[in-house]
Curated annotation (Swiss-Prot):
This is Holo-[acyl-carrier-protein] synthase. Belongs to the P-Pant transferase superfamily. AcpS family. One of its GO terms (biological process) is fatty acid biosynthetic process. One of its GO terms (cellular component) is cytoplasm. SUPFAM superfamilies: 4'-phosphopantetheinyl transferase. GO terms for molecular function: holo-[acyl-carrier-protein] synthase activity; magnesium ion binding. Keywords: Cytoplasm, Fatty acid biosynthesis, Fatty acid metabolism, Lipid biosynthesis, Lipid metabolism, Magnesium, Metal-binding, Transferase. The keyword ATP-binding does not apply. It catalyses: apo-[ACP] + CoA = holo-[ACP] + adenosine 3',5'-bisphosphate + H(+). Its EC number is 2.7.8.7. Its cofactor is Mg(2+). It holds the Pfam family ACPS. It is found in: Cytoplasm.
Length: 125
């Protein structure tokens, strides 16, 4: 049964500009430590940030809380399975909320030229 659905679209230039203006200190506000390591290897830094930001925003909308505790940006990670499918991993208090509500997240991310978009479905597992 579906618990919530969320979607978000982000202009790649917006996140690229944020990183160019604020440098690496913005990474701690947006990314998990593993995502920061992945960011350092990314060919297109702005696109990397935009895709993750869109995914995290879409997740917070599906959860129904928006981005606020426990659904903070550094508590949500975008990873990939062996075939490249994007996966959401949650940490800390947010992971406990998902466990207690028996929720599982499904994520789709896409990007084209100027935009990144993400769609999240939260379902009762």
């Amino acid at each position: 049964m579906i618990y919530g659905i969320g979607t978000d679209i982000v202009a790649v230039a917006r996140l690229r500009g944020m990183w160019e203006r604020h440098g690496d200190r913005v990474l701690d506000k947006l990314l998990t430590p593993q995502e920061i390591a992945d960011f350092s290897k990314a060919a297109d830094k702005g696109r990397f940030l935009a895709k993750r930001f869109a995914a995290k925003e879409a997740f917070s909308k599906a959860l129904g809380t928006g981005v606020r505790p426990p659904a903070t940006l550094p508590a949500i990670a975008v990873t990939h399975d062996d075939l490249g499918k994007p996966i959401l991993e949650c940490y800390g208090q947010l992971a406990e909320v998902l466990k207690n509500k028996n929720l599982r997240a499904h994520l789709s991310i896409s990007d084209e030229a100027e935009y990144a978009v993400a769609y999240v479905i939260l379902e009762h597992a």
